[in-house]
Structure formats: structure tokens, C-alpha cells
């Protein structure tokens, strides 16, 4: 009994604060580290340490719940356990944390806390020095009797168990091989005891007190096992395995230390999981799965890799909002005001949201619609989704789908794989905590496809109101109801969306803005936002509407306002520099006036030498407020204009016409240029054209050849056969951009008619429309975006197919007032509108007398 403990710990120890678990000397446990102080301790001390001493920590039990993670150091327990960190395992799911495997060495007492941040460090006094223990027994025989009594109860308890179990046999050998003074701590950590009882054993520095406290615990375990054997006599072999002794896997390299794989903290967590499963409102099928998994978890050693997977699965199941939802705000008037305040224009989109609210007032169990906002970048599709959630009073979650090429991102990974995780849909529901959020599926048109599956196909189940009430994630493997989720998708174009997915969504077009709308958006939203971000006030900067119009027309050319917002940011940064310099100059002038009187400033400026211009500039008067941003200031800040109205210059010779094109970025004007030369009747097409546009060019030249006599069109040799000894070259500028589609047909005909007639096309006319071989003009799409592009370019007359006349109702009235429209049903009408004075013919060509 007089052996001396050979362990010597440092006099200063970093403190690891635990909440419920208690580590006793000689035992081993795993603990999770996720608070700020403990994380900093692991990263600074364990991960960067190079010596054995750096792996020794002071474990302080019974500290306040680390979930609060307050800035102040909580009250610390007086006695702790010096521990050796054996293993550190890091993980980022569900949040960054480390799992430590630590072995208790000896007790210590805190003398003084030396520092609290970034992690506590204390001066400690080592206890458990057996030669220093005060012998409070009257004789040494009394301490020996306590030791023998403890040993007998320990042996009796172990012999009641199944000795065929390796862990039990190992424990029996330890009782004979380890010193008696080490057994109370080890046995207490193995048998089922509460944290309070463990804490009492830890506080018992005297060996006599530890024996006296541990013996009743052993007696209680023995009596419990006897009672269990009486009540379940037929299953005697199983009874020996049921005793609440944790499995002992191995003896560590430290004498008397045992590894405790399933510590009290884990058991408490399992009990909490069971309680959450019982009280949760999950469906019956999910509840059965959770009950089955929790039973498997109880029988599973913590060292098994599947232990963490099963535990994470159960934690996810109890955290999912199976029946938790928010109450919708169905005040249509308030919703209208909120939408108008957040977004200007977009009347069609706002009307659809208000319609949804109105129907919800009449029918509470309405399934969430599947909306898809389609429009060019920068028009506010994503922000509208956030405003819809705000209007309804729902939670909002954005899922970026651009570049996603694995269906597991949508449906989740099966739990058989290492590192499996739920899909983005289920993970988003866990994040928001309710089952009726607004989910924004951003950039749904940019989904990829790979060997891992097609995520667009996985979305079919999610976005189908008839199926998504029973959505099954591969990770959960049980059904989850998504029918209450309001899904909003965004896309730049519907061309790349699979037809099956497109069929499940309600398409709402979000066109680009007019110049007037951009001006309103700039002065209502963009400029105030930029002023706030740059610390400026309206008293320091003034941007007139004429300046805003100049930025829109000469420095940006887009359907949205994203580039416009960046230009305002550049202006605000330049003004911020002026304001900051002005404040510096005011302070410098004030100091100069105080030092030398009122005339000091003039004296300094008069005596300034040419090489000291910088000093004179420092003493110049600060700028007057507010700083006015005019055309000269724009040129200084943003540089020379990026875009000029060059339409008239480019149409100064025959063989050039202006068409209108639609792109995912919005509408734009497109020039078509033609040239002829001596040759063999070949047609050359350049400008990265698609097959459809090439066919339109061949249609145009064929129609003109068949009607050359009626329009008096000849080649350079005076022949009505336009390709006789003549080659034609058609070019579409912006050659790096791929172009395709049938809407350039009327533009190609007009361009070639100008080339062969030698007449100029009107410089204020743009056109769009598909042609047929018989000279008919067929309707095309994207009329609104094309008209807005022509308006931005300063064009005044637009030729569109007659069957597109209905699309003019979507054009804002202020744009209509600036433009005149010609609706054409055949190419005769197109040519008459494209040339000054019309395009005269000897006999008006009909639809039947054209010939090739």
C-alpha cells in the first residue's frame, strides 16, 4: 500500500472544460470538443505540439453547459484530472468539432487561473501522491481491511458475469495485477454510476474515503444483478451479459489505465435521443425506423465506424421539422405594399404572388405552386424570391444549382457509403426548421449531367405536386412531405431545361427593364444602398437623373441593373476619397489658422515652390458639398463612354441592315453586313452561325433571285441572276458569339436587297421575323426584350411579324410612345418600311407568281 505514483505532471496545465462527463484517473474516455475555448486549445496545443508534455491536459468536469459559450470563464470545479491526449479526430459535419480520446493520469487541484483567453491555463498542484495521503485510520490494519473488503466485492461482482466474455476475463485479471489503490477509480468508471457519484469519487482525495464511497456502489450492482437473475431465470447466460458494465477493450500503456469506449456522456446522449424520438411528431414509418436504429446503437461499440453514422442519422431524424410550420400572412393589401416597396415594375410577377395569397385565404390546404422565373441576369429574380418569403412570413432558403452534376446532391447519398450526407432539400429543411419554407432553386437551367446521374431527373420528384408529398431521400430512406414547400426556380433561358422538368413548372417571364424603369430603380434602391455601403449621405453627393440616364445609355448595355449598380459603386468610392481628403484638409487648415493666424494660409500658398505642389494641394480648400456628378465627373470617374450610338455611321453604305436578337442576357441589336464580288455564285456565311440561321440566309437569297426582275435587282454585270459570276459574303459581327435562330430572316433579305439595289436602309429601323420561301413573315419569340433593346439603342421604327402584334401589349406605354411599329405579313411590306420612299416594283409581287 505504500507504492509511490511515478507520474509527474507539469505545474501549469491548459484546462479542457467538460459539461457532464467525469474522467477518473486510470480510465479512458472519448469527449467531443465544439466550444470556442476547447477548439482553440486543441488547435494550438495538441495539433501544433511537438512534445509529450504538450499532450497533457487538465480536464475540469461539471462546468456550465458549453452550448452557451459565453465570453466570461464559467466557475471551475476545484479538483480535476490530468489527462493524456491519445487521439484527435476532426470532423466538419454537422458542425466543426474534434473528438478526443483521453486517458486519466492523476488528480490535481487548481491553485490559480493564469489566463482565460484564448483557452484557460492554470497553475495546479498534483494530488494522488500516495506517500503524502494523511492516514486518518486509527491503524494501518483498518485501511487494509477496507482494501480487502473492496477486493472481495469486486471479485464477487466479476464472478457473477459470464467469464467467457473477453472483457470480463480481462477485468478479472486486472483485479489481481493492479495496485489496490488504483482500483476504486477504475471500477467506478466501469460500473453504471451517475455523474454526481463520479464527481464525489473524484473529490475524494483520501484513499480511505474512496474505498468507503466505492464499496456501496459495488454492493448496489451485486444486488441488482441478483434481482435480475431471479426475475429472468430461464435466460441465465443472457443475464450475465446484461449487467451495466461497459466493455473494456484494451489496457493502455499507462499502468492502471483502462479505455472506456462508451462513457456516461454517450449513454446520456442516447437517452436524450430516445426521449426526442418518443416526443417527436414524425410519421409512424419514420418512428419505427428510429426505434430500430436506436436499439442497434445501444448494442454497438463506439469504436465501430457505423456508430457515428447511426448516431448522426438519428440526430438528423429528430431535428427534421416533420410537422412544424409557420403561419402564412395572408393580408393581400400589406403584401402588395411590401412587394411594391422591394421591387419596381414586375407587375406580372407580383400579380401571380397576390393570386396565390388570395387562393390561400379561400383554401388553407392548397399545395405550394412550382414557379419558375425566367429572365436575363440582374433583373431581380433571386431577390424577388426572398421578397415572396418575406411577404408570406415564411423562412427562406436558397439552393444554388449551377454546375451541380450529381443526383446525390438532390436525393442524398445512401448510408452505405463513407461520408454519406442528406441531399440539399432535406439539409435545407433542417436548416430552416420548418416544413413550409420558400425554397429558391437558383440557376435551374445550368444543371449538369455526369456519370453520377442526372440531377434534373432527380428534381422531377421534388417539383411534382402529385409526388412530392412522399419524397424519399436516399439518406433518410423514409418519406418526407414536401407539399407545403413553395418552390421557386430561376433560369436565364428555358432552352436548356429538360422538357419533363419544364412541364412541372409554371413559367413566369421576367423581362429586362426599360430606361425609365432603370432610372426609378437606381434612385429608389441602388443609389441609397451604395450610399449606405460607402458611408455617404445625400448631403455629400448628388446624382441627377440626367447623369443616371447617361450611365445607362453610354456606360452599360444590359437588360438588368447589375452593371449599373457597379457603376454607382465606383462613383461612390471616388466621392468617398474626396470627402475623406476634404475632412483631412479642413483639419489641417484649422491647425494652420490656430498656429499663424488668418493670413497664414495665403502665406504658405504664395511661398510654395513648383516642386511642392502636393503640399499646396493639401492646403487647398475642401470640396463644396454636395458633390454634383455631371457628365464631366462621369468621364473622370468612369473613363470615356463604353458605348456610342453608332447606328447611323454603320448604315452609311448599302448592304447593311439592323436586326433584333434575343439572348439569355436580354435583347440586343444585331447588324447584318453583305458584300458581293466576282466569283462562281457561292454564298459565304461568317459569324459563328448555327444551322437554322444558315438556312435562313439560303432562303433569303433564293427568294431574292426569284423576285429579282420585279424589284429590278441586278448583279454587277446587269444580270437578273444575282449569283451569275458573283459571290456573296454575309457577315454577322461579334464573331466570337454563337448565333442561331430563324428571326434574322427578314434582316438578311433587307440587307441583300440593299446590296443589289444600291439603296441605303433607314438608319432608325430594326426588324425581326422568320421568312418562308414564298415570302411570308412568320412570328418569332422574345418580342418585348427585342423592342427594349431597340429602344436602348435609340432606334425609332421597328418591323415585326403581324402575328406578333399581340405581344405589343406587354411593352410599357412610355416605350410605345417613343417607337413606331410596322406589322408585316409578307416581305413586300418589310422592304417598303425599311427603305425611304418604299421599295418600288414594276408589278407588285404576289405569293403565287414567285419562281426560283
From Swiss-Prot:
Its EC number is 3.4.21.53. InterPro entries: AAA+_ATPase, ATPase_AAA_core, Lon_bac/euk-typ, Lon_lid, Lon_proteolytic, Lon_Prtase, Lon_prtase_N, Lon_prtase_N_sf. It is found in: Peroxisome matrix. The keyword Hydrolase applies. ATP binds at residues 375-382. GO terms for biological process: protein import into peroxisome matrix; protein processing; protein quality control for misfolded or incompletely synthesized proteins; protein targeting to peroxisome; regulation of fatty acid beta-oxidation. Gene3D superfamilies: 1.10.8.60, 1.20.5.5270, 3.30.230.10, LON domain-like, P-loop containing nucleotide triphosphate hydrolases. Keywords: Acetylation, ATP-binding, Hydrolase, Nucleotide-binding, Peroxisome, Protease, Serine protease. GO terms for molecular function: ATP binding; ATP hydrolysis activity; ATP-dependent peptidase activity; enzyme binding; peptidase activity; protease binding; serine-type endopeptidase activity. PANTHER family: ATP DEPENDENT LON PROTEASE FAMILY MEMBER. The modification N-acetylserine is found at residue 2. The keyword Mitochondrion does not apply. GO terms for cellular component: cytoplasm; nucleus; peroxisomal matrix; peroxisome. It catalyses: Hydrolysis of proteins in presence of ATP. It is an enzyme of class 3 (hydrolase). ATP-dependent serine protease that mediates the selective degradation of misfolded and unassembled polypeptides in the peroxisomal matrix. Necessary for type 2 peroxisome targeting signal (PTS2)-containing protein processing and facilitates peroxisome matrix protein import. May indirectly regulate peroxisomal fatty acid beta-oxidation through degradation of the self-processed forms of TYSND1. Residues 13-222 form the Lon N-terminal domain. The active site is at residues 743, 786. This is Lon protease homolog 2, peroxisomal. It comes from the Eukaryota. A motif (Microbody targeting signal) lies at residues 850-852. Residues 651-837 form the Lon proteolytic domain. Pfam families: AAA (PF00004), Lon_C (PF05362), Lon_lid (PF22667), LON_substr_bdg (PF02190). Interacts with PEX5. Interacts with TYSND1. May interact with enzymes involved in beta-oxidation of fatty acids, including ACOX1/AOX. SMART domains: AAA, LON. Belongs to the peptidase S16 family.
Amino acid at each position: 500500500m505504500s507504492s509511490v505514483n511515478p507520474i509527474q505532471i507539469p505545474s501549469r496545465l491548459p484546462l479542457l472544460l467538460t459539461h457532464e462527463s467525469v474522467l477518473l484517473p486510470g480510465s479512458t474516455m472519448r469527449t467531443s470538443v465544439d466550444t470556442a475555448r476547447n477548439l482553440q486549445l486543441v488547435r494550438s496545443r495538441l495539433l501544433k505540439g511537438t512534445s509529450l508534455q504538450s499532450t497533457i491536459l487538465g480536464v475540469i468536469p461539471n462546468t456550465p453547459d458549453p452550448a452557451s459559450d459565453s465570453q466570461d470563464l464559467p466557475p471551475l470545479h476545484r479538483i480535476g484530472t490530468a489527462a493524456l491526449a491519445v487521439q484527435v479526430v476532426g470532423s466538419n459535419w454537422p458542425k466543426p468539432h474534434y473528438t478526443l480520446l483521453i486517458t486519466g493520469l492523476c488528480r490535481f487541484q487548481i491553485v490559480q487561473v493564469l489566463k482565460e483567453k484564448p483557452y484557460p491555463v492554470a497553475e495546479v498542484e498534483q494530488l494522488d501522491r500516495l506517500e503524502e495521503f494523511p492516514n486518518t485510520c486509527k491503524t494501518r490494519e483498518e485501511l487494509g481491511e477496507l482494501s480487502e473488503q473492496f477486493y472481495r466485492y469486486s471479485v464477487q461482482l466479476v464472478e457473477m458475469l459470464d467469464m467467457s466474455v473477453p472483457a470480463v476475463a480481462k477485468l478479472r485479471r486486472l483485479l489481481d495485477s493492479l495496485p489496490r489503490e488504483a482500483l476504486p477509480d477504475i471500477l467506478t468508471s466501469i460500473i453504471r454510476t451517475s455523474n454526481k457519484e463520479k464527481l464525489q469519487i473524484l473529490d475524494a482525495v483520501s484513499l480511505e474515503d474512496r474505498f468507503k464511497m466505492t464499496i456501496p456502489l459495488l454492493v448496489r450492482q451485486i444486488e441488482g444483478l441478483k434481482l435480475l437473475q431471479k426475475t429472468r431465470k430461464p435466460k441465465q447466460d443472457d443475464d450475465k451479459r446484461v449487467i451495466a458494465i461497459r466493455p473494456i477493450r484494451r489496457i493502455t500503456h499507462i499502468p492502471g489505465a483502462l479505455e472506456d469506449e462508451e462513457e456516461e456522456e454517450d449513454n446520456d446522449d442516447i437517452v436524450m435521443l430516445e426521449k426526442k424520438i418518443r416526443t417527436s411528431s414524425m410519421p409512424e414509418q419514420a418512428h419505427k425506423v428510429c426505434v430500430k436504429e436506436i436499439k442497434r446503437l445501444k448494442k454497438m461499440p463506439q469504436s465501430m465506424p457505423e456508430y457515428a453514422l447511426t448516431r448522426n442519422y438519428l440526430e438528423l431524424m429528430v431535428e427534421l421539422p416533420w410537422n412544424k410550420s409557420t403561419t402564412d400572412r395572408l393580408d393581400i393589401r400589406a403584401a402588395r405594399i411590401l412587394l411594391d416597396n422591394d421591387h419596381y415594375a414586375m407587375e406580372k410577377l407580383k400579380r401571380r404572388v397576390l393570386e396565390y395569397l388570395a387562393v390561400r385565404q379561400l383554401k388553407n390546404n392548397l399545395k405550394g405552386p412550382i414557379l419558375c422565373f425566367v429572365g436575363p441576369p440582374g433583373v431581380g429574380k433571386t431577390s424577388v424570391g426572398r421578397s415572396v418569403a418575406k411577404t408570406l412570413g415564411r423562412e427562406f432558403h436558397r439552393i444554388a444549382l449551377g454546375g451541380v452534376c450529381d443526383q446525390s446532391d438532390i436525393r442524398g447519398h445512401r448510408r452505405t457509403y463513407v461520408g454519406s450526407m442528406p441531399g440539399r432539400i432535406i439539409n435545407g429543411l433542417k436548416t430552416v426548421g420548418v416544413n413550409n419554407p420558400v425554397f429558391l432553386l437558383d440557376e435551374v437551367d445550368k444543371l449538369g449531367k455526369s456519370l453520377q446521374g442526372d440531377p434534373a431527373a432527380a428534381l422531377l420528384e421534388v417539383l411534382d405536386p402529385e409526388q412530392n408529398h412522399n419524397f424519399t431521400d436516399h439518406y433518410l430512406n423514409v418519406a418526407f412531405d414536401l407539399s407545403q414547400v413553395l418552390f421557386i426556380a430561376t433560369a436565364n433561358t428555358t432552352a436548356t431545361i429538360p422538357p419533363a422538368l419544364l412541364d412541372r413548372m409554371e413559367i413566369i417571364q421576367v423581362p429586362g427593364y426599360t430606361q425609365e424603369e432603370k432610372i426609378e430603380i437606381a434612385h429608389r434602391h441602388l443609389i441609397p444602398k451604395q450610399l449606405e455601403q460607402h458611408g455617404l449621405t445625400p448631403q455629400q453627393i448628388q446624382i441627377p437623373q440626367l447623369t443616371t440616364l447617361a450611365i445607362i445609355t453610354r456606360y452599360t448595355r444590359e437588360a438588368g441593373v447589375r452593371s449599373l449598380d457597379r457603376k454607382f459603386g465606383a462613383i461612390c468610392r471616388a466621392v468617398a476619397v474626396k470627402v475623406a481628403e476634404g475632412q483631412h484638409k479642413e483639419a489641417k487648415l484649422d491647425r494652420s489658422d490656430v498656429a499663424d493666424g488668418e493670413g497664414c494660409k495665403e502665406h504658405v500658398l504664395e511661398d510654395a515652390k513648383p516642386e511642392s505642389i502636393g503640399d499646396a494641394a493639401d492646403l487647398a480648400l475642401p470640396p463644396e458639398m454636395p458633390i454634383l456628378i455631371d457628365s464631366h465627373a462621369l468621364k473622370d470617374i468612369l473613363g470615356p463612354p463604353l458605348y456610342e450610338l453608332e447606328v447611323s455611321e454603320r448604315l452609311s453604305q448599302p448592304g447593311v441592315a439592323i436586326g433584333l436578337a434575343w439572348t439569355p442576357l436580354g435583347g440586343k441589336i444585331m447588324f447584318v453586313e453583305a458584300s458581293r464580288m466576282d466569283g462562281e455564285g457561292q454564298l459565304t456565311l461568317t459569324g459563328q452561325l448555327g444551322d437554322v440561321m444558315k438556312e435562313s440566309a439560303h432562303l433569303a437569297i433564293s427568294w431574292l433571285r426569284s423576285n429579282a426582275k420585279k424589284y429590278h435587282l441586278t448583279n454587277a454585270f446587269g444580270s437578273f441572276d444575282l449569283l451569275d459570276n458573283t459571290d456573296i459574303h454575309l457577315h454577322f459581327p461579334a464573331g466570337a458569339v454563337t448565333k442561331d435562330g430563324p428571326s434574322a430572316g427578314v434582316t438578311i433579305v433587307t440587307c441583300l436587297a440593299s446590296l443589289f439595289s444600291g439603296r441605303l436602309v433607314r438608319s432608325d429601323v430594326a426588324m425581326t421575323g422568320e421568312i418562308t420561301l414564298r415570302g411570308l413573315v412568320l412570328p418569332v419569340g422574345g418580342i418585348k426584350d427585342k423592342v427594349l433593346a431597340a429602344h436602348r439603342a435609340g432606334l425609332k421604327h421597328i418591323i415585326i411579324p403581324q402575328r406578333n402584334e399581340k405581344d405589343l401589349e406587354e411593352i410599357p406605354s412610355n416605350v410605345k410612345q417613343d417607337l413606331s411599329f410596322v406589322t408585316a405579313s409578307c416581305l413586300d411590306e418589310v422592304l417598303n418600311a425599311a427603305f425611304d420612299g418604299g421599295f418600288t416594283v414594276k408589278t407588285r409581287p404576289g405569293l403565287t407568281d414567285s419562281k426560283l
